[in-house]
Amino acid sequence: MNPMDRQTEGQEPQHQDRQPGIESKMNPLPLSEDEDYRGSGKLKGKVAIITGGDSGIGRAAAIAFAKEGADISILYLDEHSDAEETRKRIEKENVRCLLIPGDVGDENHCEQAVQQTVDHFGKLDILVNNAAEQHPQDSILNISTEQLEKTFRTNIFSMFHMTKKALPHLQEGCAIINTTSITAYEGDTALIDYSSTKGAIVSFTRSMAKSLADKGIRVNAVAPGPIWTPLIPATFPEEKVKQHGLDTPMGRPGQPVEHAGAYVLLASDESSYMTGQTIHVNGGRFIST
């Protein structure tokens, strides 16, 4: 189905009482794959880690990477059914997939996940730091210290940990891709802590790009706008879910599959002269960087 035909009048009101959300319970299901897309070997022989790769944007990137020939480790928290579905779709492309459940906010888990990947596949070429959580609050006064620390641990500490553990295995020509957000640039009154982590990711991306440029390792980011992923019904009330994405110039939420090409570009040699940059996929909102 063409993403442009989807959800121009919003979504069915819905809410999930857990984070992370479960993709298989969403209505309609997000579009994670372009069945007409044919890979051309851009990532053939490469090995990628994708955090939060079980669903949403991470799943879409994983499927596209698989179509381009990459073997993939999927890191996820505990959404086992979504992760198994992603694994099946990856393995349909005749590449290998390793599922690694656990909390990327935990440094020890990050170290173990990288080592498992290298032990299983023999190397590592691409790191996609994509996992995130958000907890809307009407005021900063309602953001507890526990929530603040948890959001930062998942969203930005995990990127430090994963990058540190991955770096000894990355060589010239390898790539790191970080998922930031439009909220890093526009802010969001209900997502003050989340937006702060996403702003930190932009600075982290730029700083790491400078740090690793002489080693030939590229570091870039993707900044999604309002996208139809499990995080939306898992965080917002039903009425806000219904209206999600309708205020964009394109008049609809984006689909995960509409981000896949950006991740493939940044993972492949086609972005050999790009580092420290952010690709904005947001339905037409103009961003001052």
UniProtKB/Swiss-Prot annotation:
Listed PROSITE patterns: ADH_SHORT (PS00061)
Oxidoreductase recorded as keyword: yes
Keywords: Oxidoreductase
Keyword Nucleotide-binding belongs to the record: no
Gene Ontology MF term list: oxidoreductase activity, acting on CH-OH group of donors
Binding annotation for NADP(+): 49-73
Ligand binding (substrate): 181
SUPFAM superfamilies associated with the record: NAD(P)-binding Rossmann-fold domains
E.C. code: 1.-.-.-
Biased composition (Basic and acidic residues): 1-20
Active site: 194 (proton acceptor)
Region Disordered, annotated ranges: 1-39
Pfam families per UniProt: adh_short_C2
Family note: Belongs to the short-chain dehydrogenases/reductases (SDR) family.
Protein known as: Uncharacterized oxidoreductase YhdF
Originating organism: Bacillus subtilis (strain 168)
Top-level taxonomy: Bacteria, Bacillati, Bacillota, Bacilli, Bacillales
